[in-house]
């Protein structure tokens, strides 16, 4: 367990004595017994989108372990990126009588009726990583600052090309994420806004003319779709040897497809700057090999710790608020203004992501979720051997 998680779980042990986060009354029952009784009789339902993307496997299994280590029972379901299946999976957990639902939605707009059923049975709902839309059943949202994810990518490109001092022009193409994923727009907007000044000045040029999210979106974040789209872009705008300086991809699965297209179809002699997000193992290998330049990493330890803290407070009858951040030990903010899901503004705990390049891979090892291979060249997932 990393330092962040240890701090959180230590703080949470004391919270089990509290009726809320704001006030604690006297309790003669020993803390350990109280915590075991409170959590041991309660079940958390975790709904993840799919096993086909590495990050959801990592998040799901890690969350399950952290909740179980804290004494909760857990139902964990993956829904194969099918909205109907996710609705059925959640309905099944409601029928099983779970005490709390923690949901990473496939499509945040498709769960309204199902979550109305959860609300009718007084089952609280926490949206994990992706905001769930158009329902008042969602109590809290735990994620990273998704606009900052894109902003970090854009600022990385700015610094790599020295756009504040170099005249350019440099050519850039964007690959965005799934239109059904509420986060995808934040990622794209953060990156585009960070670079808009240089696009307006003509230092950055987009030969394809694809400047809108809808033009560069990748349904289901599929690698094959990203490959096809970039292959078409290269054939249409770069086949004459026009130089591609930057391929800005919102995440690692799309970056994989774009990297494949560049390797097979790009006629230029340079290796374009290629961005990503998530810290997937194959992409980290590509970073070492110079195929991908960076990835934005969202530490699942921190996200799980924040989710556990919010969940525990809710399950114990408390009201999570800004004060909860003091126990996290991770850089985070409490946002009550930004995330309006169509019914209300959802109180949100937003953690801070960071940039990973070939020069700071050890930072991932320090999370405990990665390790160096036998040759100390590439990273492997510790989850593969646990």
Each model region followed by its residue ranges:
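A residue-level marker of the well-folded mature domains of exported/periplasmic proteins
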Residues: 2-5, 24-386
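Sec-dependent signal peptide hydrophobic core
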Residues: 5-16
């Amino acid at each position: 367990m990393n330092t962040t998680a240890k701090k959180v779980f230590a703080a949470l042990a004391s919270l089990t004595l509290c009726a809320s986060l704001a006030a604690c009354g006297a309790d003669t029952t020993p803390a350990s017994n109280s915590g075991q009784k409170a959590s041991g009789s309660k079940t958390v339902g975790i709904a993840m989108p799919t096993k086909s993307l590495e990050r959801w496997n990592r998040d799901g299994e890690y969350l399950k372990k952290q909740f179980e280590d804290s004494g909760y029972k857990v139902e964990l379901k993956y829904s194969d990126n099918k909205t109907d299946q996710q609705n059925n999976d959640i309905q099944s957990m409601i029928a099983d009588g779970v005490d709390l639902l923690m949901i990473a939605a496939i499509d945040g707009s498709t769960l309204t009726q199902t979550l109305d059923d959860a609300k009718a049975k007084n089952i609280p709902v926490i949206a994990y990583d992706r905001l769930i839309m158009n329902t008042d059943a969602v109590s809290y949202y735990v994620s990273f600052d998704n606009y900052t994810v894109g902003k970090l990518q854009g600022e990385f490109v700015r610094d790599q090309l020295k756009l504040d001092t170099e005249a350019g022009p440099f050519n850039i193409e964007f690959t965005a994420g799934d239109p059904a994923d509420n986060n995808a727009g934040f990622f794209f907007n953060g990156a585009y806004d960070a670079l808009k000044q240089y696009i307006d000045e003509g230092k950055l040029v987009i030969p394809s003319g694809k400047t809108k999210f809808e033009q560069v979106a990748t349904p289901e974040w599929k690698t094959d779709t990203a490959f096809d789209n970039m292959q078409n872009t290269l054939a249409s705008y770069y086949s004459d040897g026009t130089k591609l300086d930057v391929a800005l991809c919102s995440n690692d699965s799309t970056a994989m497809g774009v990297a494949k297209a560049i390797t097979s179809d790009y006629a230029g002699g340079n290796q374009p700057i290629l961005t990503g997000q998530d810290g997937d193992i194959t992409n980290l290998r590509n970073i070492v090999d110079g195929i991908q330049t960076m990835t934005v990493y969202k530490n699942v330890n921190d996200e799980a710790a924040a989710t556990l803290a919010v969940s525990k407070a809710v399950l114990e009858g408390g009201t999570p608020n800004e004060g909860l951040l003091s126990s996290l030990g991770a850089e985070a903010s409490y946002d009550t203004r930004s995330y309006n899901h169509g019914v209300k503004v959802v109180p949100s705990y937003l953690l801070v992501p960071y940039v990973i390049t070939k020069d700071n891979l050890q930072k991932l090892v320090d999370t405990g979720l990665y390790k160096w291979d036998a040759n100390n060249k590439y990273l492997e997932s510790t989850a593969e051997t646990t």
